[in-house]
């Protein structure tokens, strides 16, 4: 189940707000300019879907977002625990960074934890299948796929070059709860 936990960015020990209610999550995130919606990822995928399979099955959803926001490129990120780059990628994504464009993800299977550092708070968003998340350009954040990742998400970009991170060097991600599933 999707969830949102909010912390002060100066106290990782005590959440100041938590919910698993999609409407409450959407309101909290919309209030800070973050788009969160529950979509329907109902298409059946194979056990280890290729990028081509995922893109073909969800072309309608991609087309909707492209028409709405003018995205120039999209791809699929799919991670399983047997991926030889799993630990390396987890470490990379756990480093706080920003993008000069919105970061848009539609989760079609599995889960991951997006952590936003915004307005003196940390917003930890557990995204699962059916979740659409759009993080505004310039928002400091990190992503935790967990020690045993299992997720597939469609990523959409304003930039035809795709995912380009600008790391902040802040070690704040080291002190907040991680995804342990």
UniProtKB/Swiss-Prot annotation:
It is an enzyme of class 1 (oxidoreductase). Gene3D superfamilies: Jelly Rolls. The keyword Oxidoreductase applies. Pathway: Amino-acid biosynthesis; L-methionine biosynthesis via salvage pathway; L-methionine from S-methyl-5-thio-alpha-D-ribose 1-phosphate: step 5/6. It holds the Pfam family ARD. Its EC number is 1.13.11.54, 1.13.11.53. GO terms for biological process: L-methionine salvage from methylthioadenosine; L-methionine salvage from S-adenosylmethionine. One of its GO terms (molecular function) is acireductone dioxygenase (Ni2+-requiring) activity. Its cofactor is Fe(2+); Ni(2+). Binds 1 Fe(2+) cation per monomer. Transmembrane segments: none annotated. The record marks 102 as: May play a role in transmitting local conformational changes. Keywords: Amino-acid biosynthesis, Dioxygenase, Iron, Metal-binding, Methionine biosynthesis, Nickel, Oxidoreductase. Ni(2+) binds at residues 97, 99, 103, 141. It catalyses: 1,2-dihydroxy-5-(methylsulfanyl)pent-1-en-3-one + O2 = 3-(methylsulfanyl)propanoate + CO + formate + 2 H(+); 1,2-dihydroxy-5-(methylsulfanyl)pent-1-en-3-one + O2 = 4-methylsulfanyl-2-oxobutanoate + formate + 2 H(+). Fe(2+) binds at residues 97, 99, 103, 141. The record marks 96 as: May play a role in metal incorporation in vivo. The record marks 105 as: Important to generate the dianion. Belongs to the acireductone dioxygenase (ARD) family. PANTHER family: ACIREDUCTONE DIOXYGENASE (PTHR23418:SF0). Catalyzes 2 different reactions between oxygen and the acireductone 1,2-dihydroxy-3-keto-5-methylthiopentene (DHK-MTPene) depending upon the metal bound in the active site. Fe-containing acireductone dioxygenase (Fe-ARD) produces formate and 2-keto-4-methylthiobutyrate (KMTB), the alpha-ketoacid precursor of methionine in the methionine recycle pathway. Ni-containing acireductone dioxygenase (Ni-ARD) produces methylthiopropionate, carbon monoxide and formate, and does not lie on the methionine recycle pathway. Monomer. This is Acireductone dioxygenase 2.
